[in-house]
Amino acid sequence: MSELELAFQHVAGASAPEAERVQAWLEPVFEAHGRGGELTVRIVDEDESRALNRDYRGRDKPTNVLSFPCELPPGLPAEAAQILGDLVVCAPVVAREAAEQGKPEADHWAHMLVHGALHLLGYDHEDPAQAERMEAEERRILAALGVPDPYQER
C-alpha cells in the first residue's frame, strides 16, 4: 500500500482543522482498506456546498460533506488508479451540527472526514444493511482515533 497524499484546499473563511490533523484522521481509513494515493480535501462555505449538492445530488441546500470518487476512463496507466477522489467539507455546516449535537467540533470533523472517505471506498447508507455496515466501520475507525461513537444518543 502506498501513502496518502493529501491536497488541502481551504477556500472558506470559516475555521477548519489544520491539514496535518485532517490527514491524521483520514490515514487510518485508507490504511484499514489497504489503499493509498492522492486525495483532495476542499473546505468550503455554504454557497459552494449548496451549489455542488444541488448540481450533483439534486438537493438545493448546503451539506456537511460531499464525496467525489475518482472514476477513471479505461486504458489509463496503473499509476492513475492512485487518485482516490475529492472530499468537500462545508465548515459552517460542520460547526453548526457539532453545536446542535452537543459534541466537540473536532470530533464531528473527524466523523465527517471518515464518513466521506468511506464513501470514496464504496461504502453507502442507502438501505438499512448498508447503513449498519458503514456506521460500524465509522465507529471502529473513530474509536481507534479516540473519538466517541457519533451515533450514541447524548
Curated annotation (Swiss-Prot):
Main enzyme class: hydrolase
Residues spanning the signal sequence: none
Top-level taxon of origin: Bacteria
GO-annotated molecular function: metalloendopeptidase activity; RNA endonuclease activity; zinc ion binding
Swiss-Prot/TrEMBL cofactor(s): Zn(2+)
EC number: 3.1.-.-
Record-linked InterPro entries: MetalPrtase_cat_dom_sf_prd, YbeY, YbeY_CS
An annotated GO BP: rRNA processing
Cofactor binding notes: Binds 1 zinc ion.
CC per GO annotation: cytoplasm
Record carries keyword Nuclease: yes
Pfam families in UniProt: YbeY
Protein task: Single strand-specific metallo-endoribonuclease involved in late-stage 70S ribosome quality control and in maturation of the 3' terminus of the 16S rRNA.
Family to which this protein belongs: Belongs to the endoribonuclease YbeY family.
Entry protein name: Endoribonuclease YbeY
